[in-house]
Protein backbone atom coordinates (compact mmCIF):
# COMPACT_ATOMS: atom_id res chain seq x y z
CA UNK A 1 0.00 0.00 0.00
CA UNK A 2 1.32 3.45 -0.92
CA UNK A 3 1.60 5.82 2.03
CA UNK A 4 0.66 9.39 0.99
CA UNK A 5 2.31 10.65 4.20
CA UNK A 6 -0.64 12.79 5.24
CA UNK A 7 -1.00 11.61 8.83
CA UNK A 8 -1.45 14.57 11.20
CA UNK A 9 -1.31 17.07 8.34
CA UNK A 10 -3.81 19.87 8.84
CA UNK A 11 -6.21 20.42 5.97
CA UNK A 12 -8.50 23.41 5.49
CA UNK A 13 -11.30 22.65 3.02
CA UNK A 14 -13.88 25.19 1.87
CA UNK A 15 -17.31 24.36 0.48
CA UNK A 16 -17.30 21.17 2.49
CA UNK A 17 -20.83 20.72 3.80
CA UNK A 18 -21.81 18.54 0.83
CA UNK A 19 -20.61 17.09 -2.47
CA UNK A 20 -16.95 17.16 -3.40
CA UNK A 21 -15.85 19.13 -0.35
CA UNK A 22 -17.50 16.74 2.09
CA UNK A 23 -16.04 13.75 0.25
CA UNK A 24 -12.60 15.38 0.39
CA UNK A 25 -12.92 15.89 4.13
CA UNK A 26 -13.65 12.20 4.62
CA UNK A 27 -10.89 11.14 2.24
CA UNK A 28 -8.24 13.21 4.01
CA UNK A 29 -9.45 12.08 7.43
CA UNK A 30 -9.16 8.45 6.30
CA UNK A 31 -5.47 9.14 5.61
CA UNK A 32 -4.98 10.43 9.15
CA UNK A 33 -5.09 14.13 8.36
CA UNK A 34 -6.84 16.57 10.69
CA UNK A 35 -9.62 18.38 8.91
CA UNK A 36 -11.11 21.84 9.31
CA UNK A 37 -14.04 22.51 7.00
CA UNK A 38 -15.85 25.69 6.15
CA UNK A 39 -19.02 26.34 4.19
CA UNK A 40 -21.71 28.98 3.71
CA UNK A 41 -25.43 28.53 3.22
CA UNK A 42 -26.50 31.43 1.06
CA UNK A 43 -30.16 32.21 0.45
CA UNK A 44 -31.83 30.44 -2.46
CA UNK A 45 -35.08 30.90 -4.38
CA UNK A 46 -36.76 27.77 -3.09
CA UNK A 47 -39.01 27.38 -0.05
CA UNK A 48 -38.15 25.05 2.81
CA UNK A 49 -40.96 22.77 1.68
CA UNK A 50 -39.55 22.57 -1.87
CA UNK A 51 -36.07 21.81 -0.55
CA UNK A 52 -37.40 19.13 1.78
CA UNK A 53 -39.36 17.44 -1.00
CA UNK A 54 -36.28 17.41 -3.22
CA UNK A 55 -34.23 15.76 -0.46
CA UNK A 56 -36.91 13.16 0.12
CA UNK A 57 -37.29 12.31 -3.57
CA UNK A 58 -33.56 12.27 -4.28
CA UNK A 59 -34.27 13.20 -7.90
CA UNK A 60 -31.46 15.29 -9.34
CA UNK A 61 -31.98 18.85 -10.47
CA UNK A 62 -31.46 22.42 -9.32
CA UNK A 63 -33.76 22.08 -6.30
CA UNK A 64 -31.87 19.06 -4.95
CA UNK A 65 -28.54 20.79 -5.55
CA UNK A 66 -29.70 23.85 -3.59
CA UNK A 67 -31.06 21.57 -0.86
CA UNK A 68 -27.62 19.96 -0.55
CA UNK A 69 -26.06 23.42 -0.26
CA UNK A 70 -28.34 24.24 2.68
CA UNK A 71 -26.99 21.41 4.82
CA UNK A 72 -24.82 22.11 7.83
CA UNK A 73 -21.57 20.19 8.25
CA UNK A 74 -22.58 18.79 11.63
CA UNK A 75 -23.27 15.24 10.46
CA UNK A 76 -20.03 15.17 8.46
CA UNK A 77 -17.97 16.25 11.47
CA UNK A 78 -19.73 13.74 13.71
CA UNK A 79 -19.08 10.94 11.21
CA UNK A 80 -15.37 11.73 10.90
CA UNK A 81 -14.84 12.06 14.65
CA UNK A 82 -16.85 8.92 15.46
CA UNK A 83 -14.61 6.99 13.06
CA UNK A 84 -11.51 8.06 14.96
CA UNK A 85 -10.64 11.14 12.93
CA UNK A 86 -10.30 14.76 13.95
CA UNK A 87 -12.51 17.38 12.35
CA UNK A 88 -14.02 20.78 13.06
CA UNK A 89 -16.34 23.01 11.05
CA UNK A 90 -17.12 26.70 10.87
CA UNK A 91 -19.64 28.49 8.67
CA UNK A 92 -18.18 31.57 6.99
CA UNK A 93 -19.04 33.83 4.06
CA UNK A 94 -15.79 33.98 2.09
CA UNK A 95 -17.10 36.71 -0.20
CA UNK A 96 -16.26 38.99 2.75
CA UNK A 97 -12.44 39.19 2.73
CA UNK A 98 -12.34 40.08 6.43
CA UNK A 99 -13.60 36.57 7.27
CA UNK A 100 -10.59 34.85 5.72
CA UNK A 101 -7.91 35.65 8.35
CA UNK A 102 -10.50 34.89 11.04
CA UNK A 103 -11.01 31.47 9.46
CA UNK A 104 -7.29 30.71 9.53
CA UNK A 105 -7.09 31.96 13.13
CA UNK A 106 -9.86 29.58 14.16
CA UNK A 107 -8.29 26.64 12.35
CA UNK A 108 -4.97 27.32 14.05
CA UNK A 109 -6.69 27.55 17.43
CA UNK A 110 -8.53 24.24 16.95
CA UNK A 111 -5.93 22.20 15.07
CA UNK A 112 -2.78 24.17 14.26
CA UNK A 113 -1.32 25.87 11.16
CA UNK A 114 -2.71 24.85 7.78
CA UNK A 115 -0.50 22.47 5.78
CA UNK A 116 -2.94 21.77 2.95
CA UNK A 117 -5.42 24.28 1.57
CA UNK A 118 -8.29 22.95 -0.53
CA UNK A 119 -10.32 25.76 -2.08
CA UNK A 120 -13.55 24.13 -3.16
CA UNK A 121 -16.38 26.57 -2.43
CA UNK A 122 -18.46 27.82 -5.34
CA UNK A 123 -21.30 30.11 -6.32
CA UNK A 124 -23.33 29.39 -9.43
CA UNK A 125 -26.36 31.23 -10.77
CA UNK A 126 -27.00 30.84 -14.49
CA UNK A 127 -26.42 34.08 -16.38
CA UNK A 128 -26.52 34.97 -20.06
CA UNK A 129 -25.83 37.86 -22.43
CA UNK A 130 -28.72 36.79 -24.66
CA UNK A 131 -32.27 37.85 -23.66
CA UNK A 132 -33.73 34.97 -25.69
CA UNK A 133 -32.13 32.49 -23.28
CA UNK A 134 -33.69 33.96 -20.14
CA UNK A 135 -36.06 31.51 -18.44
CA UNK A 136 -37.55 30.67 -15.07
CA UNK A 137 -37.53 26.94 -15.78
CA UNK A 138 -35.32 24.72 -13.67
CA UNK A 139 -32.96 26.90 -11.71
CA UNK A 140 -33.62 29.77 -14.08
CA UNK A 141 -31.34 31.76 -16.37
CA UNK A 142 -31.07 35.49 -15.88
CA UNK A 143 -29.47 38.34 -17.76
CA UNK A 144 -25.96 39.09 -16.62
CA UNK A 145 -25.59 42.11 -14.38
CA UNK A 146 -22.98 44.02 -12.42
CA UNK A 147 -24.24 42.44 -9.22
CA UNK A 148 -24.19 38.93 -10.70
CA UNK A 149 -20.70 39.29 -12.12
CA UNK A 150 -19.37 40.77 -8.89
CA UNK A 151 -20.84 38.00 -6.74
CA UNK A 152 -19.45 35.20 -8.91
CA UNK A 153 -15.98 36.71 -8.94
CA UNK A 154 -16.05 37.63 -5.24
CA UNK A 155 -16.72 34.03 -4.25
CA UNK A 156 -15.21 31.93 -7.06
CA UNK A 157 -12.10 34.01 -7.81
CA UNK A 158 -11.25 36.67 -5.25
CA UNK A 159 -11.88 34.46 -2.23
CA UNK A 160 -9.67 31.71 -3.70
CA UNK A 161 -6.88 34.23 -4.32
CA UNK A 162 -7.11 35.80 -0.86
CA UNK A 163 -7.19 32.35 0.74
CA UNK A 164 -3.95 31.49 -1.09
CA UNK A 165 -2.37 34.80 -0.06
CA UNK A 166 -3.34 34.27 3.58
CA UNK A 167 -2.00 30.73 3.46
CA UNK A 168 1.37 31.86 2.09
CA UNK A 169 1.67 34.74 4.56
CA UNK A 170 1.27 32.40 7.52
CA UNK A 171 3.42 29.72 5.88
CA UNK A 172 6.33 32.16 5.59
CA UNK A 173 5.90 33.55 9.10
CA UNK A 174 6.31 30.12 10.62
CA UNK A 175 9.14 29.25 8.21
CA UNK A 176 7.42 26.12 6.97
CA UNK A 177 9.04 24.00 4.25
CA UNK A 178 6.17 21.87 2.91
CA UNK A 179 2.77 22.91 1.62
CA UNK A 180 -0.03 22.04 -0.78
CA UNK A 181 -2.77 24.11 -2.38
CA UNK A 182 -5.52 22.46 -4.41
CA UNK A 183 -8.12 24.58 -6.19
CA UNK A 184 -11.37 23.37 -7.72
CA UNK A 185 -12.34 24.62 -11.18
CA UNK A 186 -14.79 23.10 -13.67
CA UNK A 187 -14.57 21.43 -17.06
CA UNK A 188 -16.70 24.32 -18.39
CA UNK A 189 -14.25 27.06 -17.36
CA UNK A 190 -13.19 27.80 -20.94
CA UNK A 191 -16.77 28.73 -21.95
CA UNK A 192 -20.30 27.92 -20.83
CA UNK A 193 -23.37 29.15 -22.69
CA UNK A 194 -26.01 30.46 -20.27
CA UNK A 195 -23.60 30.13 -17.34
CA UNK A 196 -21.16 32.81 -18.35
CA UNK A 197 -20.13 34.40 -15.04
CA UNK A 198 -19.63 31.07 -13.31
CA UNK A 199 -17.39 29.83 -16.13
CA UNK A 200 -15.36 33.04 -16.33
CA UNK A 201 -14.83 33.20 -12.57
CA UNK A 202 -13.56 29.63 -12.56
CA UNK A 203 -11.27 30.33 -15.50
CA UNK A 204 -9.73 33.15 -13.48
CA UNK A 205 -8.88 30.71 -10.72
CA UNK A 206 -6.97 28.53 -13.16
CA UNK A 207 -4.79 31.53 -14.02
CA UNK A 208 -4.32 32.50 -10.37
CA UNK A 209 -3.34 28.92 -9.58
CA UNK A 210 -0.66 28.72 -12.26
CA UNK A 211 0.77 32.07 -11.19
CA UNK A 212 0.76 30.92 -7.57
CA UNK A 213 2.54 27.71 -8.55
CA UNK A 214 5.24 29.75 -10.25
CA UNK A 215 5.71 32.02 -7.27
CA UNK A 216 5.37 29.56 -4.39
CA UNK A 217 7.41 26.64 -5.66
CA UNK A 218 10.61 28.02 -4.18
CA UNK A 219 9.04 27.78 -0.74
CA UNK A 220 8.14 24.10 -1.09
CA UNK A 221 4.48 24.65 -1.96
CA UNK A 222 2.78 22.94 -4.88
CA UNK A 223 -0.37 24.44 -6.38
CA UNK A 224 -2.64 22.41 -8.63
CA UNK A 225 -6.16 22.59 -10.02
CA UNK A 226 -8.81 19.89 -10.15
CA UNK A 227 -11.31 20.23 -12.98
CA UNK A 228 -14.34 18.00 -12.31
CA UNK A 229 -16.41 16.72 -15.19
CA UNK A 230 -19.99 15.47 -14.73
CA UNK A 231 -20.14 14.74 -11.00
CA UNK A 232 -23.46 14.04 -9.31
CA UNK A 233 -23.64 16.57 -6.50
CA UNK A 234 -27.41 16.80 -6.86
CA UNK A 235 -27.71 19.00 -9.92
CA UNK A 236 -27.79 16.32 -12.64
CA UNK A 237 -31.32 15.41 -13.70
CA UNK A 238 -32.19 11.78 -14.61
CA UNK A 239 -32.04 12.59 -18.34
CA UNK A 240 -28.55 14.06 -17.85
CA UNK A 241 -27.39 10.95 -16.03
CA UNK A 242 -28.73 8.75 -18.82
CA UNK A 243 -26.89 10.76 -21.49
CA UNK A 244 -23.63 10.79 -19.54
CA UNK A 245 -23.78 7.07 -18.82
CA UNK A 246 -24.22 6.47 -22.55
CA UNK A 247 -21.62 8.90 -23.87
CA UNK A 248 -18.82 8.75 -21.29
CA UNK A 249 -16.03 6.24 -22.07
CA UNK A 250 -16.09 4.92 -18.51
CA UNK A 251 -19.84 4.54 -18.70
CA UNK A 252 -21.05 6.33 -15.60
CA UNK A 253 -21.57 9.66 -13.90
CA UNK A 254 -18.82 10.68 -11.51
CA UNK A 255 -19.22 10.68 -7.75
CA UNK A 256 -17.73 13.23 -5.33
CA UNK A 257 -15.32 10.56 -4.11
CA UNK A 258 -13.78 10.34 -7.59
CA UNK A 259 -12.62 13.94 -7.25
CA UNK A 260 -11.75 13.67 -3.56
CA UNK A 261 -9.31 10.83 -4.22
CA UNK A 262 -7.49 12.95 -6.80
CA UNK A 263 -7.26 15.77 -4.27
CA UNK A 264 -5.67 13.39 -1.78
CA UNK A 265 -3.18 12.31 -4.42
CA UNK A 266 -2.26 15.93 -5.24
CA UNK A 267 -1.60 16.54 -1.55
CA UNK A 268 0.44 13.36 -1.18
CA UNK A 269 4.18 12.88 -1.20
CA UNK A 270 3.75 10.97 -4.47
CA UNK A 271 2.66 14.23 -6.17
CA UNK A 272 5.74 16.16 -5.03
CA UNK A 273 6.83 16.83 -8.65
CA UNK A 274 3.46 18.14 -9.82
CA UNK A 275 2.66 21.83 -9.71
CA UNK A 276 0.78 24.32 -11.85
CA UNK A 277 -1.23 21.50 -13.41
CA UNK A 278 -4.93 21.19 -14.23
CA UNK A 279 -6.15 17.65 -13.63
CA UNK A 280 -9.38 16.81 -15.41
CA UNK A 281 -11.51 14.29 -13.49
CA UNK A 282 -14.41 13.36 -15.71
CA UNK A 283 -14.27 9.76 -16.89
CA UNK A 284 -13.30 10.89 -20.39
CA UNK A 285 -16.48 12.96 -20.87
CA UNK A 286 -14.16 15.58 -22.34
CA UNK A 287 -10.90 14.68 -24.06
CA UNK A 288 -8.46 17.54 -23.66
CA UNK A 289 -5.93 18.00 -26.44
Language-model regions: role of each:
Residues 26, 169, 214-215, 272:
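Alpha-helical segment proximal to the catalytic Tyr-Lys
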Residues 31-75:
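Conserved glycine-rich Rossmann-like NAD(P)H-binding loop of the short-chain dehydrogenase/reductase
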Residues 66-71, 91-103, 146, 257-258:
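The beta1-alpha1 cofactor-binding region of Rossmann-like NAD(H)/NADP(H)-dependent oxidoreductases
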Residues 122-130, 136-148, 152, 161, ...:
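Catalytic loop of short-chain dehydrogenase/reductase
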Amino acid sequence: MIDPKLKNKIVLISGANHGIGAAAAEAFATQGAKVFVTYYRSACQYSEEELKKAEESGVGGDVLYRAEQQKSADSLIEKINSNGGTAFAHESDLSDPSNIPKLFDLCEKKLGPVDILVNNHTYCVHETFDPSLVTKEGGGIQLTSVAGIDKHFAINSRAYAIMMAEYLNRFLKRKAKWGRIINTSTDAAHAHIANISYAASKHAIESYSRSAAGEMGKYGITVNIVSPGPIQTGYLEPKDVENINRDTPLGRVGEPEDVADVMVFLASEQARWLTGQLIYVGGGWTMHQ
